[in-house]
Amino acid sequence: MEEKLLRLRRLPAPLLAWYDENRRRLPWREQVSPYRTWVSEVMLQQTRVQAVLPYFQRFMEAAPTAAALAELPEETLLRLWQGLGYYSRARNLKRAAQTIMEDFGGRFPDSYDALRTLAGVGDYTAGAILSIAFGQPVPAVDGNVLRVAARITGSRENVLDPKVRAACRELMAAVIPHDRPGDFNQALMDLGAGVCLPGGAPLCGECPACAFCTACQEGTQRLLPVREKKQAKREQQLTVFVLRQDGCVALRRRDDTGLLASLWEYPHADGVLDETAAAAWLAQRGVAVKSWEKTVSAKHEFTHLRWRMAGYILTVEGDGAPDWVWADHDRRQQLAIPSAFQKFTREAEGE
């Protein structure tokens, strides 16, 4: 631990000098508030910065404060989030905003323990908010920081082990500069995202830590950090139906819990159905095929699941299943349909 600490103590000065020259210009950094920092950090979980930018702007226009977010209708919330994925993040944001209004009198919590009571706020997000928005010397340790720290110190410990993450947080707490804690944490984020890249692609020649980085000196960048092998994804095959009738398309709302909870989807069947089986499946649900227009295939990756989808675009007649809604174009624009069905949505809209 002492050797690791000695190396990391050399990091703040060159890292902050590098950050001052290379920092990313991002809207939540140009106008800092606890609320904006929180929303941006939640959006950035599992999502690239460039993908987040337009969503952040729209979200701030629709819900510029915790009070506005607490009152935002769920349908509007999910529509704003459509395409970002991991929709539980959006629901947790609203739940947390309601907690801020009800339990904290509308005042954003400024302590670690209080922040951790908010839905969806973990150790990293709490550290980011406290350091960036409140200037408190609290580390924010995510995958980028774990990678940077493992390479600088030469650690061969498994970074997916919670004990290793906790140890890294302890080390960073010992070296974070009290005069610029937010900049230090954001500099680490930028370094990990743009220079100390995963795999064999780090740009060591551009890194302010290269002179004292163990991995750079020993050529072990490809080996660090050590991670357990990911669990193989379960694969599920689906047949998706884009059913057209009188200018409307059939949609159904998913269950309130579980994967893609409460979002809207096209009717679909488990497995891959040929036209005969598909027509029978539809007939059981009260619709008859008038014309088969097109077949479409797509796939979508979730964290532990892969969907392989075969789809039919077709014109039908009949009422359909009780939980189906026949939505015209204007209504469809108001509903949150997950990006997993993006290819089918383009077909439904004639794009």
Task: Name what the model sees in each region.
Residues 2-205, 209-218, 286-287:
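Catalytic cores of DNA base-excision repair glycosylases
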